[in-house]
Amino acid sequence: MKLSARNVLEGKVLSLKKGPVSTEVDIETKGGERVVASITTASADSLKLEVGKKVYAVIKASNVMVGTDE
């Protein structure tokens, strides 16, 4: 797999929260960090995502969102 993005984190799916339009994917990276991504449910289905499946979190600086619990 070749990508232009420089930040590619290998990991596994910890959990999926599927909705009618979007799915929240909780990923644990090889380094032990957790990344949560929101993707379309159609994409989650197309990728056949399931808990424990090996995945890659691809992060481009222009597409990162930051939030707080406050």
Question: Where are each of the predicted segments found?
Answer:
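Non-catalytic connector elements of ABC transporters
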Residues: 1-70
